[in-house]
Amino acid sequence: MNLFDKKHLVTQADALPGRNTPMPIATLHAVNEHSMTNVPAGMEIAYFAMGCFWGVERLFWQLPGVYSTAAGYAGGYTPNPTYREVCSGQTGHAEAVRIVYDPAVIRYEQLLQTFWENHDPTQGMQQGNDHGTQYRSAIYPLTPEQNAAAHASRERFQSAMAAAGDHRPITTEIAHATPFYYAEDEHQQYLHKNPYGYCGIGGIGVCLPPDA
C-alpha cells in the first residue's frame, strides 16, 4: 500500500505494530466528572465514528442519559495507536467515540438518530474537509440487538434520503466492535477545553424516521 494513500484501508499485514501500553488519560470526564473508564451497573456502551472526534464527542456528551464519553480509535488493527499514527492511515482505525449511556433514559435508537442526523454518511473516506480513512462513517455494535438496530436504521435513513431527493448511497461501515483504544488526553473533551476549537461535523438535512 502507498504510504500516502489515505483513501484505502490498510491491510492487517501492513498495519503499524503499535504498543502494549494504553495512552494515559484523566480519571474523570472534564465536563461531568464521571469516570472515564468504569461502566456503572445497568448502563451500556455504544461506539460511533462520524468524522473528527472532537465535535462528535461534544455532540453526545450533551445528550440526557449519557453518562460519559471518550475520544479514541476503533475499527483498525494497531494496538494503542497514537493520533499521528492514525492520521497516517497505517493503523486501519477510525476516529471514534465511546459512549456510556443509561438505556432507561436514552435508547440506543436515539443515539443512532443523533448519529445519522449530524454528519454526512455518504462520503466514504472523508467527512467534509477532513480526508482520510480515519474520518470514515462507522457504527461498531457490541451486541446482536445493537447490530440489528444499526442495520435497520441505515435502511430507514437511506429511504429518507431518497424521499428527500438525495440518491447517494450510504457508505457507513457497520461492523462488530473490535477493541477501542483511548486517544491521548489532549483529545478528551477537546471542545470543552478549547471552546473555539475546530468542529467539522454537520448533517445533510434529513431526519431518521422512527423505528416501527
UniProtKB/Swiss-Prot annotation:
InterPro entries cross-referenced by the UniProt entry: Met_Sox_Rdtase_MsrA_dom, Met_Sox_Rdtase_MsrA_sf, MsrA_MetSO_reductase
Top-rank taxon: Bacteria
One GO location term (cellular component): cytoplasm
Pfam families to which the protein is assigned, alphabetical: PMSR
Keywords per UniProt: Oxidoreductase
Record family assignment: Belongs to the MsrA Met sulfoxide reductase family.
Function: Has an important function as a repair enzyme for proteins that have been inactivated by oxidation. Catalyzes the reversible oxidation-reduction of methionine sulfoxide in proteins to methionine.
Protein's recorded name: Peptide methionine sulfoxide reductase MsrA
Organism of this sequence: Salmonella choleraesuis (strain SC-B67)
